[in-house]
Every structure is written in structure tokens, then in C-alpha cells.
């Protein structure tokens, strides 16, 4: 059945993520977000896509979208990227005007970092 077919193959997903990273490296977050939004809709549990999209949205000034994406990505992030994702989440909250929320996330990140060392 056609509805059961994936929207993106693994190779297409990987190619779009690499292209998005290249756009981010070239300071073109809007272009990265354009590539990542449909990918995120198709693969909402793909942490790498969500993290990359959060960075693209934050860099594009879409702080509310970035905060929402980063909040979800932070909870699912593997330990080796959790601190970085927490900082992105806190920055998005700060820029959206939620300073108490940003402080709370920063304190949580610092506490987790301290217990892991």
C-alpha cells in the first residue's frame, strides 16, 4: 500500500541532513530550515533532524519554533550532545523572553554536567 511507504529513504534523509549542515556552516539557516521542515514532519522522532532544525530556526530568528523543537530534542538527546542541546534550548527561551525558563534549563544542564563528571 502506498501509504505505508516512507516519505524519504535513508539515503535521501542523510543527503538532506548533510545539505542542511552545509547551509548552516555557510550562515544560511533559512535554506537549512527549508530542507529540514518536511524531513522533520516525516520523521518526528529523528533526533538529529530535530536538533539541526532547532539550530536552523534559532539562527533564523524563529525563537518560538526553536524553543519548542529544542525542548523535545533536549529530552531525547544522547548524553554526548545533551549539554549542547540544553544550551540551544536555553538560548531560544532567553531570546523568546522566557528568562526564568532559560535559567531553569541552564541550572538543569549544569547539574547534569556536574553529576556526569
Model-found features: residue ranges?
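Start-of-helix register in tetratricopeptide repeats
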Residues: 14, 48, 81-84
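Alpha-helical segment of the N-proximal tetratricopeptide repeat
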Residues: 10-34
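Short coil turns that delineate tetratricopeptide repeat
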Residues: 44, 78-80, 114
Amino acid at each position: 500500500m502506498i501509504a505505508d511507504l516512507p516519505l524519504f529513504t535513508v539515503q535521501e534523509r542523510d543527503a538532506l541532513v548533510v545539505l542542511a549542515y552545509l547551509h548552516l556552516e555557510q550562515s544560511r539557516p533559512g535554506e537549512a530550515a527549508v530542507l529540514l521542515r518536511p524531513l522533520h514532519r516525516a520523521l518526528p522522532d529523528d533526533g538529529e533532524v530535530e536538533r539541526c532544525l532547532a539550530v536552523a530556526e534559532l539562527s533564523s530568528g524563529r525563537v518560538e519554533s526553536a524553543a519548542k523543537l529544542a525542548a523535545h530534542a533536549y529530552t531525547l538527546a544522547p548524553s554526548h550532545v545533551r549539554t549542547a542541546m540544553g544550551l540551544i534550548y536555553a538560548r531560544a527561551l532567553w531570546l523568546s523572553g522566557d528568562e526564568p525558563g532559560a535559567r531553569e534549563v541552564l541550572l538543569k544542564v549544569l547539574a547534569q554536567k556536574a553529576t556526569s563528571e
